[in-house]
Amino acid sequence: MVNPKVYFDMTVGDKAAGRIVMELYADTVPETAENFRALCTGERGIGKSGKPLHYKGSAFHRVIPKFMCQGGDFTAGNGTGGESIYGMKFKDENFVKKHTGPGILSMRNAGSNTNGSQFFICTEKTSWLDGKHVVFGQVVEGMDVVRDIEKVGSDSGRTSKKVVTCDCGQL
């Protein structure tokens, strides 16, 4: 099985920042990978929230340097929302993959079995998250873009410039 690759074309402020390409671990966490893949393509249409099940146009609302860049809340835009292709939330599939370093792609949650659409890209090793957040992919191209996003973050997570996924899809 070949794992799917997806992309985000990013803007920081009003400038194009470049493309992030991510490999999804469909061989290890197929349900989690499929959720993210389908949210990249937008192929599932409108969700229960009444909003498109699509990352296009959504922001990275929380960026903490030397930790992570978080996005995926396309319903509220501020970290309180989001929705999966399976309904509002879905279970933790497994914790086989670990938060081993920069570029790891993991699900943001609010406790066990509360995965939706929010995710984060690690900018450092974050082993304290192992067993709590499902790792489902990794950045394979565009880590420089992630580093540029990291530069507009702060200790509080607030960004100094708007960080937006202006386009996304599957390669």
From Swiss-Prot:
Means of activity regulation: Binds cyclosporin A (CsA). CsA mediates some of its effects via an inhibitory action on PPIase.
Predominant place of localization: cytoplasm
InterPro entries: Cyclophilin-like_dom_sf, Cyclophilin-type_PPIase, Cyclophilin-type_PPIase_CS, Cyclophilin-type_PPIase_dom
SUPFAM superfamilies noted in UniProt: Cyclophilin-like
Pfam families cross-referenced by the UniProt entry: Pro_isomerase
Record keywords: Cytoplasm, Isomerase, Rotamase
GO CC annotation terms, alphabetical: cytoplasm
Recorded catalytic activity of this chain's protein: [protein]-peptidylproline (omega=180) = [protein]-peptidylproline (omega=0)
Name this protein carries in UniProt: Peptidyl-prolyl cis-trans isomerase
Species name: Brassica napus
Name of encoding gene: CYP
